[in-house]
């Protein structure tokens, strides 16, 4: 059986067709066009699936990687920073158009599964995968299988409370991790401190003045406390970082030290590594979730 994986992102939708050995047959990327609304996204996804399906005569399985979690009871999307998806039965609507069942999972779980089986965490038993981009998400893989929890929210460390009564989050809570260490939050904090609106990749090029040092110190402290809490609860064999924020080099030395300083144990050597698959993790993870589903 061949596999189609779709990665639905905030700015792009990527699709891939793989054979049984995970060799790429066809790959395509299109724009998401959130401004055109929910129905446009459903149409774009189903059209891309049909286009990829036409490239093979084999049977197919389809997996879709989405921002946000599918509510286990109602089947609607929640906790998505792609706001037009919120409250919508995305899986059901796609299946109605295609005429067959698909598998759907959130982007952090797809990322973690892909990195566990094909990437930086290959060979480790208990893996915590982190996405720090527009938002903050996490996933847990144990012995090669996703651990999703009773209500599909296992690993959602981005909505742990870092500061009670802190920054407002789109989820309705205050003080969520996401509102402090996502790329969006970091750029917002930089603007507050300096009055400059700059992309994160520019900000980290020069952190020599006092405001920049303050920004970095706050970031490292929040990163360290947030991940230390995960280690205290899960004690994973490895943590893999993904998303645009994961490209910041100092997270892997200074950042790791801040994590270690805040962990309960005095014996701590948890590897904290950068992802191997880059922005391909989503589509590969979408294909891999179909393996889990069809076992």
Sequence positions of predicted segments:
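ATP-binding/phosphotransfer module of carbohydrate and carboxylate kinases, centering on a glycine-rich
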Residues: 1-61, 71-74, 92-100, 116-123, ...
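Short glycine-aspartate micro-motif
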Residues: 3-7, 61-63, 103, 127-131, ...
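A cytosolic small-molecule/anion-sensing beta-strand core signal
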Residues: 19, 66, 142-143
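A short acidic/small-residue loop/turn micro-motif
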Residues: 32-33, 85, 153-156
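A charged helix-plus-loop insertion that forms the helical arch/lid used to bind
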Residues: 75-86
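Active-site glycine-centered loops adjacent to acidic/histidine catalytic or metal-binding residues
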Residues: 107, 133, 286
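Glycine-rich phosphate-binding loop of actin/hexokinase-like ATP-binding domains
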Residues: 122-180
């Amino acid at each position: 059986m061949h596999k189609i994986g779709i990665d639905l992102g905030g700015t792009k939708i990527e699709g891939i067709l793989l054979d049984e050995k995970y060799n790429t047959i066809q790959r395509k990327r299109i724009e998401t066009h959130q401004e055109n609304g929910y129905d446009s996204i459903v149409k774009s996804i189903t059209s891309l699936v049909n286009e990829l399906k036409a490239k093979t005569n084999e049977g197919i399985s389809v997996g879709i990687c989405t921002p946000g979690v599918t509510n286990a009871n109602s089947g609607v999307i929640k906790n998505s920073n792609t706001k037009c998806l919120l409250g919508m039965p995305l899986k059901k609507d796609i299946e109605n158009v295609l005429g067959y069942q698909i598998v759907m999972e959130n982007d952090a779980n797809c990322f973690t599964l892909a990195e566990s089986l094909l990437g930086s965490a290959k060979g480790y038993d208990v893996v915590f995968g982190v996405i720090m981009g527009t938002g903050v998400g996490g996933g847990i893989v144990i012995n090669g299988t996703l651990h999703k929890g009773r209500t599909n929210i296992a690993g959602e460390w981005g909505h742990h409370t870092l500061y009670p009564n802190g920054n407002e989050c789109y989820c309705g809570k205050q003080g969520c991790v996401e509102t402090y260490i996502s790329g969006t939050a970091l750029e917002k904090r930089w603007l507050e401190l300096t009055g400059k609106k700059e992309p994160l990749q520019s900000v980290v090029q020069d952190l020599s003045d006092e405001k920049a040092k303050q920004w970095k110190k706050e970031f490292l402290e929040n990163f360290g406390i947030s991940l230390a809490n995960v280690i205290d609860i899960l004690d994973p064999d490895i943590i893999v970082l993904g998303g645009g924020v994961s490209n910041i080099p100092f997270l892997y030395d200074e950042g790791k030290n801040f994590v270690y300083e805040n962990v309960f144990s005095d014996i701590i050597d948890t590897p904290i590594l950068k992802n191997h698959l880059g922005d391909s993790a989503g589509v590969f993870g979408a294909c891999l979730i179909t393996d889990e589903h069809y076992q």
